[in-house]
Amino acid sequence: MSSAATLLARHAVASAVLTLVLAGCSSRLPAPDWALNAESASQRASTAYLEGRQRVQAMEWDKARAEVAATGRTDLAARVELMRCAAQVASLEWDDCPGYQALALDAAPAEAAYARYLQGKPRPEDVALLPELQRPVAQALLGAPASALAAVGAIKEPLPQLVAAGAALRAGAAQPQLLELGAETASAQGWRRAVMAWLLLQARAHDQAGEVDKAQAVRRRLSLLEKTASGGGASAGTSAGASVGTSAGK
């Protein structure tokens, strides 16, 4: 297996893009240029999105789409769109993933399963098809969403963990510990957009619980982020937090 495939395996979201292409590769056969270019552009796009760098993320997603489009394979194009959806879920920007939906008819079963998981609606038959790091979370969500916290906390890689936290929250696991985990995971990576979204939701949860001091502490962190925001990061985070504002009260 090539070093590119190893890198993708560490990145539970990005790994889906080239799984079929690289699954049968040998050390003597390098991955095709389009695959490597799509992988690197997708990773840069995901990072830029999480950081709130709007123009950069848009440019890099366009690059990734163009590289995959050169193959004429709509199933691979669907995977790229799911990667973008995963970054949105990690940042609490929830929609129906229209880019993926436009290609859903050609998506493989694993992609359909992942799309449902990102919406917080996994099915029992989906679990085995998901990225390995996400399977325990999906299994927990099938039982009681509140039990997913431990499974999310067991994920040690930042982006897969944040994606799992977003999926769990979307499924109804709006626990204070989950909100804190999401905020601190994003904070440790400097992902401004995601940090702001999770902190906004955390502040609202403290407000609803009557925890005035904790709410004020979170808002001081938000104030710092807003003062230093650039490239639209502040407004992006505010929008993301607003899109799930009612979840904290569930």
Residues covered by each model-derived region:
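Sec-dependent bacterial lipoprotein signal peptides
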Residues: 1-25
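Bacterial Sec signal peptide processing site at the extreme N-terminus
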Residues: 19-44
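Residues that mark the junctions of alpha-helical repeat units in TPR/alpha-solenoid scaffolds
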Residues: 30, 37, 56, 77, ...
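TPR repeat positional signature
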Residues: 41, 60, 76-77, 81, ...
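Structural register within alpha-helical repeat arrays
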Residues: 44-45, 84, 163-166, 182, ...
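Short, charge-rich amphipathic alpha-helical segments embedded
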Residues: 64-95, 188-197, 226, 231
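Alpha-helical linker/edge segments of TPR/alpha-solenoid repeat scaffolds
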Residues: 84-110, 121-130, 207-214
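Extended amphipathic alpha-helical interaction segments
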Residues: 110-191
